[in-house]
């Protein structure tokens, strides 16, 4: 056991993983993840930023409760559990909450209502919250992917459907990936040593979203009422003509739920090429697979088109920020950002292949490649709630 100071645990649930980070007296004591939850779960962690032998060890984590037990087992090597004073969770859907919230029974009940709108993440977060609330006598705090977008202008968050229905069911563009977009902005401005007024952030992982930011505030984003809206993603269709859904229900004899599952799990890049991972697509293109090439071109085209739309919405652009696994691939940086020179987005080929953090521009618009750090951002913005 390395220390007994007051500690904060950060929990970040994904669709098949749980990231965790333990802060001990404001320093990172351990950073880890249980991924591939199910039959082939693995536990990896870094102690004080030094990789340990336990990188990628197989663990018994068939579900999120068992994954949480594995996390507890790791934590006990670093801190007495009673010294963990705060637990901070990433929750994908927070409705209209615009700030982190102490988790009370009423807050938890409210968050559970949003599970159908974020089925890949919300139920997992609820399972983890209930588990750790039983295990740890600490302050439990929720941070929401939606809260960065909670004050978007009505022009951006309104759907053109009957107002009575929108109000009755709270149907609006909530936006997601907010913790990622906010952390990307924070990182780029820290590296640049300056603030940017007009910014577009691009979260490029298996889930894809862009955000238009003016003076540090989200003013538009691609995801909407659910994380299914927006750009094409690894397995998600992104925005499509809504009439396609009843059409498929009728002609394929499917229920709306079945069609929704198809759009969430069997669409996007996977539908176009057979692969959802950009690395597999790049390898396929190299082998001469025409479907992989088309999927990559399709993907880059739609991102470029959205960047152009947000430049118009912002009336200019000072900084473009890319983060997430796809942003680490120089070939994807080139593919996505080529052809935007008329917008002032010009690549510096000399540093295009450099690892993040790096500014890869030689035009008037700064282009930053930085790492997303949701856990660090969550720790920072919950300071007031943690220290009450």
Regions found by a protein language model. Name each.
Residues 151-248:
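Glycine-rich phosphate-binding loop of actin/hexokinase-like ATP-binding domains
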Residues 16-61:
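Short glycine-rich, Thr/Ser-proximal phosphate-binding strand/loop in the N-terminal lobe
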Residues 184-187, 191, 294-315:
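Phosphate/ATP-binding catalytic cores across multiple sugar-kinase/actin-like superfamilies
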Residues 318-340:
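Glycine-rich phosphate-binding loops at beta-strand->alpha-helix junctions
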Residues 251-295:
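A mobile "lid/hinge" subdomain adjacent to the ATP/sugar-phosphate binding pocket shared
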Residues 72-121, 139-141, 147-156:
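Short beta-strand-loop/turn "lid" adjacent to the catalytic site in phosphate-handling enzymes
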Residues 327, 341, 348-388:
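Glycine-rich phosphate-binding/hydrolytic loop that grips phosphoryl groups
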Residues 3-9:
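Extreme N-terminal starter segment of soluble prokaryotic enzymes
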């Amino acid at each position: 056991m390395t220390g007994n100071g007051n500690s904060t645990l950060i929990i970040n649930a994904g669709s098949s993983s749980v990231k965790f980070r333990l802060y001990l007296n404001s320093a990172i004591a351990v950073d880890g993840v249980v991924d591939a939850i199910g039959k082939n779960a693995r536990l990896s962690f870094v102690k004080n930023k030094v990789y340990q032998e336990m990188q990628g060890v197989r663990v018994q984590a068939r579900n999120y409760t068992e994954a949480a037990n594995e996390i507890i087992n790791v934590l006990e090597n670093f801190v007495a559990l009673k010294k963990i004073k705060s637990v901070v969770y990433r929750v994908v859907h927070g409705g209209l909450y615009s700030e982190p919230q102490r988790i009370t029974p009423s807050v938890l009940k409210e968050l559970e209502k949003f599970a159908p709108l974020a089925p890949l993440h919300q139920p997992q977060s609820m399972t983890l919250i209930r588990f750790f609330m039983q295990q740890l006598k600490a302050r439990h705090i929720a941070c929401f992917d939606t809260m960065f977008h909670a004050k978007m202008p009505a022009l951006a968050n309104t759907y053109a459907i009957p107002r009575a229905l929108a109000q009755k069911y709270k149907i609006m563009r909530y936006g997601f990936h907010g913790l990622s977009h906010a952390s990307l902005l924070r990182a780029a401005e820290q590296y640049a040593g300056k603030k940017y007024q007009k910014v577009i952030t691009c979260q490029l992982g298996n889930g894809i979203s862009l955000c238009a930011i003016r003076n540090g505030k989200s003013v538009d984003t691609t995801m909407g009422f659910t994380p299914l809206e927006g750009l094409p993603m690894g397995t998600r269709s992104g925005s499509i003509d809504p009439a396609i859904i009843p059409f498929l229900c009728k002609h394929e004899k499917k229920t709306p739920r079945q069609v929704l599952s198809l759009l969430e799990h069997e669409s996007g890049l996977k539908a176009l090429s057979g692969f959802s991972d950009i690395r597999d697509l790049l390898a396929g293109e190299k082998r001469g697979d025409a479907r992989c090439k088309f999927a990559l071109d399709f993907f880059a085209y739609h991102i470029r088109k959205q960047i152009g739309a947000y430049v118009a919405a912002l009336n200019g652009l000072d900084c473009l920020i890319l983060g997430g696994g796809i942003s680490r691939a120089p070939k994807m940086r080139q593919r996505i950002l080529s052809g935007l020179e008329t917008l002032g987005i010009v690549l510096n080929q000399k540093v295009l292949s450099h690892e993040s953090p790096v500014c890869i521009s030689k035009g008037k618009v700064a282009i930053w490649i930085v790492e997303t750090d949701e856990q660090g951002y969550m720790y920072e913005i919950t300071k007031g709630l943690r220290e009450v």
